[in-house]
Amino acid sequence: MRIGIDAHIVLRKHKRYDPRIARYTEQLITNLLATDKKQEHTWVLFFDERMKSTKKFERPNVEIKRFPFIQYRKYLPMVYSHMLISSFLAAARLDVFHSPEGLIPYLYPGKIVTTFHYVPRGKSESNLFVRTFMLGARVAFAQLCKRARRIIVSSEEDKKLLVDRHGYPAERIVVMGIEEAAQGSWARRVKALIKVYKEVAGSAKKNRKKK
C-alpha cells in the first residue's frame, strides 16, 4: 500500500502547533516505520516545507514530501487553499491518507482516515472546530466528517458524540487509546492501524473494480 501521513503539525513554527498532538504524530510515524521491517508498504510523509530535517524518518520505503506554501495559506482564499492541498495529495496517488490531527481536506477525492483528539459537543463548538482545525472549511461539521472513511477517537464517549450528535456511522469509528499512547502499547496500536488502512484501501480497490 501507499500510505500517506500528514506530519506538518510536528513543526514548532506551525500556527496550530500542539505539543501533545505533535508528539502523538511523531510517535505514530516512527512506530509504523519500525514495525514495517519487511518494507511491505510505501510511506508518504507530508511535512511543512519549512521542516529542515527529516532524517529520523528517512527509510528506503519512505517518500518525503513538503506541502507547498503552507505558511502562506492564511492569505489564500479558502477554496483555493483546499484545492492546493487536495491536488498535492492526489498527485501522490495514495491508497489511503491518514491525518493524525483531525484535518479533512474536503476537496480531496482519495480515501481518508483521521484522528480526532477532540469531538465537538454542539453546533457552536462544531463551527469553531471546523474553522480552526479543518482548513477553515465553511461546510457543516457532519458533512465534512463523512469525507473520512474511518475516524479514530480515544474513548467510547467520543464515539457516542460522533454518532448521536453528528450522525457519523458507528461502524466507521475506531476507538483507540490516543491520550495514553505515549506510555507504550504501540505494537497493538500499529497492528490495529494497519488493519484500518487495509480495510479502507481494500474498499477503494473493490469500488474501482465495480466501475
Regions found by a protein language model. Give the residues of each.
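Carbohydrate transferase catalytic cores enriched for Leloir-type hexosyltransferases
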Residues: 1-211
